[in-house]
Amino acid sequence: MDLDGMRPTWAEVDLNAVRANIRALKRISKAPRLMAVVKANGYGHGAVPVATAAIEAGADWLGVASVEEGVTLRRHGISAPILVLGYVSPGQAEAVLTEGLRVALFDGELGQALNREGRRLGRWARVHLKVDTGMGRIGLQPAEVGRLGRELARLDHVEVEGVFTHLATADEPGNPYTRLQLERYEAALAELAAAGVRPAIRHAANSAGLMLHPEAHYDMVRSGIAVVGLPPAPGVAWPVKLAPALTWKTRVGLVKWLEAGHSISYGCTYTTARREQIATLPVGYADGYPRRLSNRAQVLIRGRRCPVVGVVTMDQMMVRVPDDLPVRVGDEVVLIGRQGGEEITATELAGLADTISYEIVCGISRRVPRFYGGETA
């Protein structure tokens, strides 16, 4: 990677991996539609390139968290249907209609605002009712769905295109809560039907639901983390072999030998036990490398694992290099990805940081440039 004139910390995203993941997920899906969820800047991978690659590979819809994220995709020429999965304020109704976005709807106030703007602009607002079947997050209770459905049916510029829910434990095989949520979802569908509302697109399955719960596929499945090649949870026998799309790299900035008894970084949490070879890397928690990985994680240099020593600082961190490894300034370092016969995954780092792989990749900050390979389908 040519980084002349740049700080040598970067991420590489393989768009062919994204395409392969989309095709693999579509092969096992029973639903006629697949939504690629690209919220949070495409889970840290880059929303526009990931969305483009996903659509090229056969994704039918895109999902985002906010109106602003949807507008960004539209500004880059993406014309596929986009559903805003998160909260939308009534004040955003004009942008929703102007950009042709679909929105999650769970209160009448937003419906009225969309109808007013739709009438003014001469456009229809398409909404997907969100049902809270057990996440306790946004959404209507199943018993409330019929009431709102009847209210929306009286509006002249709002179409109830879809109805959806979100599964809380789909990544836990055998957990009966998923079945309970689907039963509640079916009850909500019955409430809507009784109100004379029959949305064309029913959807409930996330990445884990897509891979483990075919009974949740309905008319569309949604996938985000699996699109970028990461398993929804560790320790599960997933039926699809996913291709991780992201590799995170830096370069050695300094190499030195420190005598026994030398402390490293803030708080002196690591002290050399003997004469040790220490490399300083130009990457830190401001780049998204979690401080919680201090004295826990490893990196790859010349295909060997090197432990992080001392506290990860804002812009730099230190690693201990094996005595027999001839490391030089400028050597490539892999933080996430493969090098030689070794691999460090986002899932591995998540386990060490007491979090999930989603947070690791979403946390890679915007000051880390992304470079894209496989840009031609």
UniProtKB/Swiss-Prot annotation:
A GO cellular component entry from the record: cytosol
InterPro entries: Ala_racemase, Ala_racemase/Decarboxylase_C, Ala_racemase_C, Ala_racemase_N, Ala_racemase_pyridoxalP-BS, PLP-binding_barrel
Xref: Pfam families: Ala_racemase_C, Ala_racemase_N
Residues reported in the UniProt entry to bind substrate: 137, 314
Keyword terms: Isomerase, Pyridoxal phosphate
Reported cofactor(s): pyridoxal 5'-phosphate
PROSITE patterns reported for this sequence: ALANINE_RACEMASE
Enzyme Commission numbers on file: 5.1.1.1
Entry-annotated residues carrying N6-(pyridoxal phosphate)lysine: 39
Pathway: Amino-acid biosynthesis; D-alanine biosynthesis; D-alanine from L-alanine: step 1/1
Active site: 39, 266
GO biological processes: D-alanine biosynthetic process; peptidoglycan biosynthetic process
Single GO MF descriptor: alanine racemase activity
Catalytic activity as recorded in UniProt: L-alanine = D-alanine
PANTHER family, per database record: ALANINE RACEMASE (PTHR30511), ALANINE RACEMASE, CATABOLIC-RELATED (PTHR30511:SF0)
Protein function: Catalyzes the interconversion of L-alanine and D-alanine. May also act on other amino acids.
Family note: Belongs to the alanine racemase family.
Matching NCBIfam families: alr (TIGR00492)
Identification of the protein by name: Alanine racemase
Species, as recorded: Symbiobacterium thermophilum (strain DSM 24528 / JCM 14929 / IAM 14863 / T)
